């Protein structure tokens, strides 16, 4: 028996070794993926686990929670990144990188949104974006509204119809589009243009001449205008309302002498070479300077000087004027790079010494300026005033041009009563304020003459909401009425002004309807002559009146009783 056991011992030993090996393999598979730990570490891990279980449910600081959550997010992000690589092994490397960047950006975005300061910045950015979009939408709606007004009313030119010819930090020059390009109605206006100038304090429009007659009117500010002739020079102190004619080809320059207020000037331009087109010829140091156009021989012979000296003194661009160089860089449109530049206070004082004020005499000379407001107004009451200069003998400047100049002031809530001009075509510029205009014409008035037989002669009302810078054309014979929603200041240029007559359709004075004889009134109107006369006499004011009828005013005053005032406070 002992011999048998001894002979089988190696076999039993071998089987025991195999059993132990299988046990070890099974244990190893069970612990796969975990870190290798020594017995001491395993014991410490067990103890820490027990401690963690004891702490479970206890209060933890917020920063520990945030750090724990952040670690979990990072772990999830890395795990998703790894799984994405494993699931899509066949994708291009750049595609995987894009996906990784997107996931990472989303994770960073979530982190930023959790930051209170970042959330505030995001809210501010979103509010600013909404505000910008709202302003843009309002601007587009206003532009569409103005375009719609112009489409419905060919007599209205909104302020955005001015084209900027020149602009820099010192001011700008703008020209209104041609009248005859808008409609055949304005065919007789093809040789008239409107130009607006604006200059900052202590600036100068440098010397130039234009191939057009100009009627210059100061809208705002104070200026010094110098007008040159072959053997003379005249300088004038100009203020608001001053008007002067500058004949075609006259060299002149204009200075804003005020310390604070911008200078605003408007020119009514009558070209002499080509209908509706004019050019400015300047003497300042730019490529539009007309002296540059002459040949060297002509310049040397004319000035009896070598060309090098002429070029240095008259033609070379100077390097001593950094302000002008900055203006050139800031110029946005046009080629007149130095049209408006800064001028020193000392230079202004020197120019001011020789300047005369506008004429206050009743009979101004042919070349002196006159002020629209220095004479008695044509019409005046508590609702408004109209000042007007007509081409009569006492105003010889306007005689050869057959143009009148007028200034209309309508107080807030007032109305210039319906009227029409017998001969004059009026170009009306809104200088200040807002209001409404109603102009009467005929339907399809813009059609060609050959279509007149088929044209409907029904009366058409054209309406316009007036804002500063807007221009309205009022043809002769077309009735018009203007109301003011704020104090309204208008400047008018009337063409074909000689023997023009303004006929009012309502009011106690200058009312053409009141002059109709009674028998004709009965034939003309549905009511009797007595009813017509009584109706006409209801308006006690002349030329200007309240925009609200007296009956409505009385009703509104009755409604504003103490009881109604108390009740209104609850609504």
UniProtKB/Swiss-Prot annotation:
Family classification: Belongs to the 7S seed storage protein family.
Main localization of the protein described in the UniProt heading: other
Pfam family for this entry, one: Cupin_1
UniProt feature, compositional bias: Polar residues: 562-571
Gene Ontology CC terms: aleurone grain; vacuole
UniProt name for this protein: Convicilin
Matches recorded under PANTHER family: OS03G0336100 PROTEIN-RELATED, VICILIN C72
Gene3D superfamilies the record matches: Jelly Rolls
């Amino acid at each position: 028996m002992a011999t048998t056991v001894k002979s089988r011992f190696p076999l039993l030993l071998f089987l025991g070794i195999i059993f132990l090996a299988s046990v070890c393999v099974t244990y190893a598979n069970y612990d796969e993926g975990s870190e290798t730990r020594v017995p001491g570490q395993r014991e410490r891990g067990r103890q820490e686990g027990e401690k963690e279980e004891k702490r479970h449910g206890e209060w933890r600081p917020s920063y520990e929670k945030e750090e724990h959550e952040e670690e979990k997010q990072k772990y999830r992000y890395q795990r998703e990144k790894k799984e994405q690589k494993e699931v899509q092994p066949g994708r291009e490397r750049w595609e995987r990188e894009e996906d990784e960047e997107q996931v990472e950006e989303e994770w960073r975005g979530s982190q930023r949104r959790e930051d209170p300061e970042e959330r505030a910045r995001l809210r501010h950015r979103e509010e600013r974006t909404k505000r910008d979009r709202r302003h843009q939408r309002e601007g587009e709606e206003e532009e569409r509204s103005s375009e719609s007004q112009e489409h419905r009313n060919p007599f209205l030119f909104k302020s955005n119809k001015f084209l900027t010819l020149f602009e820099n930090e010192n001011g700008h020059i703008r020209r209104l589009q041609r009248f005859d390009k808008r409609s055949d109605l304005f065919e007789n206006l093809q040789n008239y243009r409107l130009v607006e100038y604006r200059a900052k304090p202590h600036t100068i429009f440098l010397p130039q001449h234009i191939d057009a007659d100009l009627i210059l009117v100061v809208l705002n500010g104070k200026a010094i205008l110098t007008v040159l002739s072959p053997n003379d020079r005249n300088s004038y102190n100009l203020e608001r309302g001053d008007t002067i004619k500058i004949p075609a080809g006259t060299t002149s320059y204009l200075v804003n002498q005020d310390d604070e207020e911008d200078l605003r000037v408007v020119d009514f331009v009558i070209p002499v070479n080509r209908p509706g087109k004019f050019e400015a010829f300047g003497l300042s140091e730019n490529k539009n300077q007309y002296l540059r156009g002459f040949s060297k021989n002509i310049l040397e012979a004319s000035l009896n000087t070598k060309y090098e000296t002429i070029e240095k003194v008259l033609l070379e661009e100077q390097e001593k004027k950094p302000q002008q160089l900055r203006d050139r860089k800031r110029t946005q449109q046009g080629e007149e790079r130095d049209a408006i530049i800064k001028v020193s206070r000392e230079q202004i004082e020197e120019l001011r010494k020789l300047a005369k004020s506008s004429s206050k005499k009743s009979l101004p000379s042919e070349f002196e300026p006159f002020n629209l407001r220095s004479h008695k107004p044509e019409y005046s009451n508590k609702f408004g005033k109209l000042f007007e200069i007509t081409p009569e003998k006492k105003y010889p400047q306007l005689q050869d041009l057959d143009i009148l100049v007028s200034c209309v002031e309508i107080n807030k809530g007032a109305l210039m009563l319906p009227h029409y001009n017998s001969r004059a075509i009026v170009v009306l510029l809104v200088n200040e304020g807002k209001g409404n205009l109603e102009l009467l014409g005929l339907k399809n008035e813009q059609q060609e003459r050959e279509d007149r037989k088929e044209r409907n002669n029904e009366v058409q009302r054209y309406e316009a909401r007036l804002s500063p810078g807007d221009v309205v054309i009022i043809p002769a014979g077309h009735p018009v009425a203007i109301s003011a929603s704020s104090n309204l200041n208008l400047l008018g240029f009337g063409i074909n002004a000689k023997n023009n007559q303004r006929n009012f359709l309502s009011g106690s004075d200058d009312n053409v309807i009141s002059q109709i004889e009674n028998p004709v009134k009965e034939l003309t109107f549905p009511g009797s002559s007595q009813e017509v006369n009584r109706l006409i006499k209801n308006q006690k004011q002349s030329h200007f009146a309240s925009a609200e009828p007296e009956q409505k005013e009385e009703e509104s005053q009755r409604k504003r009783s103490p009881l109604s005032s108390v009740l209104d406070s609850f609504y």
